[in-house]
Amino acid sequence: MFLKLQKSKNKPKEYRDINGTAWLTKLIKNFLLLKFSLAMIVASPISYASNFHEEITCLATNIYWEARNQTVSGMIAVGMVTKNRVKRNTFPNTYCDVVYEAKMSKWWKEHHNKDIPVRNKCQFSWYCDGLSDKIPSYDREVWEVSLYIARGIYTDRYVDNTFGATHYHAYYVSPKWARKFRHTTTIDDHIFYRYD
């Protein structure tokens, strides 16, 4: 067999080439080094994969709580607003950081070592409304739709139906900030705005 190597008599720790196959031995060594290097590189997508999962979960959670009673188009619109915020340098640069951006209660941190958002001081109202953020088991189907939409938004499968909106509110409220923003569209119960 041409891969047969023999221990050198002079140097027991080295090998000598019997059939002129040193090039193949080098190739195998380089392949093994490359395989090791690739294994090290491939280890980093594990963190990417967990980040991907976390980001999808954060985005889906926001879509669920903000738009679970809207059409699919309305759910996509809420997800797009979240994405548009991630893309702007005036907001955090991850979905989880955008969704959970809030002023935290110092008292809770000092007395209970917990981060609890201050009511009405969050980017998205569901996060600081004082209610549980656990997805109810009876609403698993809507949660699955939210996850599907979140994956599509994260992987750029949808066109931005909000035309770059970074803010929105329900039609039945009139926040002061809305006067400073440009109206882009209305989808279902939400009115969308962009800060130009």
Regions of interest found by a model, annotated:
Residues 1-21:
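N-terminal Lys/Arg-rich, disordered targeting/topogenic segments
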Residues 2-5, 48-196:
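Bacterial extracytoplasmic/cell-wall-associated proteins, especially those involved in peptidoglycan
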Residues 21-34:
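Bacterial N-terminal signal peptides that target proteins for export
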